[in-house]
């Protein structure tokens, strides 16, 4: 019985060894599958999907690159901001000798520097990346013994002048001369230069004592006192001197107090025994303060605000119409990228207040002894004494702050993602610190020259000044 069961289970089986009959030149595993056409590889089924993935990656890369370029262009176009930095900056080039304070301008694609030698005042255009001289033009003689001082200036709003450089060259009068020479009217020559090649495009004079002279667009606004103490203000073409508009104050401005004039686009503020605010575009009177009222004014995005000891602060529309009361004047920021267009920041000294631009409604209030400096990317950079930091502009929360253990020699800047502020090395030497705008994490520290006086953003470029040198970093 057992033998039959065993015999039933044990059957003869023949095994065909295909490897014996297969050609020696081909491995059995190399045979194409029976159910696929010859020449059709399985991976080919997936090539359309792979192509789509590659296209998506390329598109994403191109989109990110476009966003980066757009971000760089947007930040670079904001006066007072530094062009976004890819790494810690290093000195690119420098100009030694006597350069007028503030006399570096962004003109077209060049950096223009006003400097004084022993013989002359000279305007020189440099390539921002290399410092190579593009052109140089003498504009006036240096100060000489026996003559009045001849300090040349080239005014600008926010350091950018576009295609036209305007320089103001005093014509010094002889000192210790005869009475006729002493009584000669002061004369100031306006020298317009093409930013492209330095070509002098004209010349015209301003005669008489000047209370103030400032640039707006390609024009100059000039304030002068009349013999009876009234203030005469003219807006004149920077190229030709042609008068755009003219205004004379109805009351004397300088009988008991010194008169002054400031251009704060879109307004011109005349100060003295009374305060008068003009429209910078056409010279219309927008506000006329009472005599000795102590009226102050500050511009804000096409509008302006006023403050007086009696009556407090008010926001005004562009035509001078009073809109609403305010707790104080709006903070004057060194840079504003427009990321909070409907917000007004007011500095009350011990507190910062955010108001709705349209209605004046208070949005938030936070205790802070620091002053607002820069508004960028919905963040408010603040500083004061030896401290600087960042607030969230949407709610006033402090995001971070740092104490440098020393008085700030210059105010912090930003490149849109970093705060570039002053600091000290462990051995007490000046440094430029870069901290993340969002959280204050320190990325790098760059040594600065001893006796650094200013660190500024000019046309997006980082400019460091000492008493004797002007150094461009990048």
Region locations from a protein language model:
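Secretory-pathway ectodomains
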Residues: 2-474
């Amino acid at each position: 019985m057992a033998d039959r069961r065993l015999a039933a289970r044990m059957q003869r089986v023949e095994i065909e060894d295909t490897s014996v009959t297969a050609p020696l030149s081909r491995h059995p595993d190399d045979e194409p599958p029976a159910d696929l056409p010859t020449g059709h590889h399985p991976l080919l089924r997936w090539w359309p999907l792979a192509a789509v993935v590659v296209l998506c990656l390329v598109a994403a890369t191109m989109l990110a690159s476009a966003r980066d370029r757009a971000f760089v262009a947007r930040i670079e176009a904001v006066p007072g901001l530094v062009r976004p930095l890819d790494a810690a900056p290093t000195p690119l080039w420098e100009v030694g000798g006597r350069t007028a304070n503030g006399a570096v301008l962004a003109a077209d694609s060049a950096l223009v520097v006003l400097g004084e030698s022993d013989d002359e005042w000279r305007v020189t255009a440099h390539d921002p990346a290399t410092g190579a001289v593009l052109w140089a033009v003498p504009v006036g003689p240096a100060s000489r013994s026996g003559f009045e001082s001849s300090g040349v200036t080239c005014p600008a709003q926010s350091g950018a002048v576009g295609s036209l450089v305007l320089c103001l060259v005093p014509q010094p009068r002889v000192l210790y001369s005869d009475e006729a020479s002493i009584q000669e009217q002061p004369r100031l020559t306006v020298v317009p230069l093409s930013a492209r090649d330095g070509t002098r495009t004209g010349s015209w004079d301003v005669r008489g004592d000047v209370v103030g002279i400032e640039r707006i667009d390609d024009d100059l606004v000039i304030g002068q006192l009349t013999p009876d103490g009234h203030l005469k203000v003219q807006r004149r073409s920077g190229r030709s001197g042609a008068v755009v508009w003219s205004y004379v104050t109805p009351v004397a401005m300088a009988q008991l107090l010194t008169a002054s004039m400031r251009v704060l686009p879109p307004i011109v503020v005349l100060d003295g025994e009374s305060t008068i605010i003009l429209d910078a575009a056409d010279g219309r009177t927008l506000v006329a303060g009472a005599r000795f009222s102590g009226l102050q004014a500050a511009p804000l995005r096409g509008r302006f605000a006023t403050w007086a000891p009696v009556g407090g602060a008010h926001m005004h529309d562009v035509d001078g119409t009073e809109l609403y009361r305010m707790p104080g004047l709006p903070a004057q920021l060194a840079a504003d990228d427009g990321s909070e267009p409907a917000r007004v920041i007011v500095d009350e000294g011990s507190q910062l207040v955010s108001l709705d631009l349209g209605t004046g409604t208070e949005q938030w209030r936070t205790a802070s002894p620091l002053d607002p400096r820069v508004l960028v990317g919905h963040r408010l950079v603040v500083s004061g004494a030896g401290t600087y930091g960042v607030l969230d502009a949407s709610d006033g929360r402090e995001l971070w702050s740092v104490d440098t253990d020393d008085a700030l020699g210059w105010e912090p800047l930003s490149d849109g993602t970093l705060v570039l502020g002053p600091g000290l090395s462990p051995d007490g030497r000046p440094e430029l610190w870069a901290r993340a705008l969002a959280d204050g994490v320190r990325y790098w520290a760059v040594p600065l020259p001893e006796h650094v006086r200013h660190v500024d953003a000019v046309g997006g470029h980082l400019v460091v000044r000492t008493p004797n040198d002007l150094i461009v970093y990048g």
